[in-house]
Amino acid sequence: MAKKVFKRLEKLFSKIQNDKAYGVEQGVEVVKSLASAKFDETVEVALRLGVDPRHADQMVRGAVVLPHGTGKKVRVAVFAKDIKQDEAKNAGADVVGGDDLAEEIKNGRIDFDMVIATPDMMAVVGKVGRILGPKGLMPNPKTGTVTMDIAKAVSNAKSGQVNFRVDKKGNVHAPIGKASFPEEKIKENMLELVKTINRLKPSSAKGKYIRNAALSLTMSPSVSLDAQELMDIK
């Protein structure tokens, strides 16, 4: 078994020039050629940013609606009340509630990928913050998931909204599609993501903003990208 895995990886590595930082177009082409799993692998971008997340003014966080989605069916939960619950249901939310939903979450219900809430429901959401937070599900105004425009937020989530946040080491990871996507769709999704991250560059960040960049599939080695080309995307 180990020998098979080694041979598979060896074959994949042979397709990559390790000392080369690929341009976006060629990088996408190479990463698609690495698809070898028996399922439709996710394409992921990893960026190392020149920020220090220990400083609040250098925390890069936001959301982007990818033009071609992620290829994943997203289940959305909404905390709202009265007419806003109706708006959520009409927009296609999978789970809608208030205190009752918070109780279900306390009892172990986590069958959704994104949580949206109206501002007046954040006190209720706060009761399950210790459960949602570590899973990256806590609603936040910066990602458009705390809003009165519930219909738009649900629509964005269903259309392929990706929420991202720099980690403690300055890295951002985000899915931008599936291996089965045409190259052009993966490229356009990546450009939209990078454009959004570039717009969020903190004014206090010094030096090179995107230090390193890579593209990979769920089961593949990573392909290095030209960080300067990505920084030039506006």
UniProtKB/Swiss-Prot annotation:
Coiled coil: none annotated. Keywords: Antibiotic, Antimicrobial, Repressor, Ribonucleoprotein, Ribosomal protein, RNA-binding, rRNA-binding, Translation regulation, tRNA-binding. One of its GO terms (cellular component) is cytosolic large ribosomal subunit. GO terms for biological process: defense response to bacterium; regulation of translation; translation. The keyword RNA-binding applies. Pfam families: Ribosomal_L1. SUPFAM superfamilies: Ribosomal protein L1. One of its GO terms (molecular function) is structural constituent of ribosome. NCBIfam families: rplA_bact. The antimicrobial peptide HP (2-20) forms a short alpha-helix. Increasing the amphiphilicity of the helix increases its antimicrobial activities. Binds directly to 23S rRNA. The L1 stalk is quite mobile in the ribosome, and is involved in E site tRNA release. Belongs to the universal ribosomal protein uL1 family. Part of the 50S ribosomal subunit. This is Large ribosomal subunit protein uL1. It comes from Helicobacter pylori (strain ATCC 700392 / 26695) (Campylobacter pylori). The gene is rplA.
